[in-house]
Amino acid sequence: MAKFIHSMIRVGDLEKSMGFYQQAFGLIESHRLDFDDFSLVYLRDVESGAEIELTWNKGQTEYTHGTGYGHTAFVVDDLDQQFNRLTGLKLSPAPIKEFKRDGALLARFFFIQDPDGYKIEVLQRGGHYQ
């Protein structure tokens, strides 16, 4: 059976991106590989063990996301507290929304963007979103 271990995104400012993911979501640096032309930094979520691989191609500062990329997602125990914390850090989360079907609440969430404009969904833990 396969195990999901990481997803990779390209970043324009490695230190800024690392700071964002560490500050916003508590990810920790688990591994780093530095080469002449690029660096790879793996940031781990200690709860799940999954990682985001930040790829910094030295000299490249901007990327396009194309039409295929949607978002990554994190769950939190207290969505309102996380929203207020990120707002206090001046990270500009979008307003909290509710997703319902036939009047039943399926999810509470908000979106935030990292320094390179990648969208991140933050969901209240519950139901399908564990």
Where are these regions (language model features)?
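N-terminal beta-strand motif that seeds the catalytic metal site of vicinal oxygen chelate
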Residues: M1-M18, Y69-F74, L123-Q130
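Core segments of cupin and vicinal oxygen chelate
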Residues: A2, M8-E51
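Short amphipathic alpha-helices within nucleic acid-binding modules
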Residues: F20, L79-R85
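Vicinal oxygen chelate
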Residues: H31, F74, F83-Q130
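Exposed loop/turn and edge beta-strand positions of beta-sandwich/beta-sheet ligand-binding modules
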Residues: D37, G68, L106
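Short, charged/polar surface micro-motifs in flexible loops or helix N-caps
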Residues: V46-A50, G59, L79-Q81
